[in-house]
């Protein structure tokens, strides 16, 4: 049983090792000029200064193509796959074995909806497959819905699921800040400060 959960965590990415990049400090003696020798000043080289390892050139992200003209304060944000272009994708899987289930989790990680048709699979394997994908969906904050006999819909958190009867799963909207009512009365603490000053 523990083996199934560890495989699920490995696939979803909860057990991924964090890799840190370490840089060696280099003496940048080429960047300093000898300030005490004024007799033979050397002209500055025409080529660009050597890059310091600590500072890298900014990398382009998927969102740079769309928002090239706008400069935002959050320049280090990397776009989610599928979020920039606004195109939603649905992956229909009809697996024959349990070994095909990681494809469904990977699609959910890429913010794609998954329709899982398990009519071909053995009932015990189908139950195991639904449990596996449901666990991955829960770990990714997604939603699941049974839409037929052995047919299931798994969606990422950015997808709203609804039927003719109403909304089954609604995408949470960020709470709007309530506007402060304009107060005509001065605050009570302001009067006390004036009394203290007198």
Swiss-Prot record:
Membership in a protein family: Belongs to the SepF family.
Gene3D superfamilies: SepF-like protein
Subcellular localization, as worded in the UniProt entry: Cytoplasm
Region ranges (Disordered): 170-198
Keywords of this entry: Cell cycle, Cell division, Cytoplasm, Septation
Highest taxon listed in the record's lineage: Bacteria
Protein name: Cell division protein SepF
GO cellular component, one term: cytoplasm
Described function: Cell division protein that is part of the divisome complex and is recruited early to the Z-ring. Probably stimulates Z-ring formation, perhaps through the cross-linking of FtsZ protofilaments. Its function overlaps with FtsA.
Stretches with biased composition (Low complexity): 179-188
PANTHER family registered for this protein in UniProt: CELL DIVISION PROTEIN SEPF
GO biological process, alphabetically ordered: division septum assembly; FtsZ-dependent cytokinesis
Key word Cell cycle present: yes
Gene giving rise to this polypeptide: sepF
Stored HAMAP family: SepF
One Pfam family here: SepF
Subunit structure: Homodimer. Interacts with FtsZ.
């Amino acid at each position: 049983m523990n083996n199934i959960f560890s495989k699920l965590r490995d696939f979803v990415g909860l057990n991924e090792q964090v890799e840190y990049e370490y840089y060696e400090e280099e003496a940048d003696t080429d960047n300093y000029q000898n300030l005490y020798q004024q007799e033979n000043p050397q002209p500055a080289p025409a080529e660009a200064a050597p890059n310091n390892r600590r500072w890298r050139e900014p990398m382009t992200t998927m969102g740079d193509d769309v928002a090239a003209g706008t400069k935002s304060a959050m320049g280090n944000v990397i776009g989610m796959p599928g979020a920039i272009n606004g195109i939603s994708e649905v992956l229909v899987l009809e697996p024959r074995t349990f070994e095909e289930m990681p494809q469904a989790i990977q699609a959910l990680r890429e913010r794609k909806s998954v329709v899982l048709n398990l009519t071909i699979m053995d009932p015990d394997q189908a139950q195991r497959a639904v449990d596996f994908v449901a666990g991955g969906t829960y770990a990714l904050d997604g939603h699941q819905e049974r839409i037929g006999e052995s047919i299931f819909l798994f969606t990422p958190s950015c997808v709203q699921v609804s039927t003719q009867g109403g909304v089954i799963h609604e995408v949470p909207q960020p709470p709007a800040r309530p506007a402060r009512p304009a107060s005509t009365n001065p605050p009570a603490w302001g009067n006390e400060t004036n009394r203290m000053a007198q």
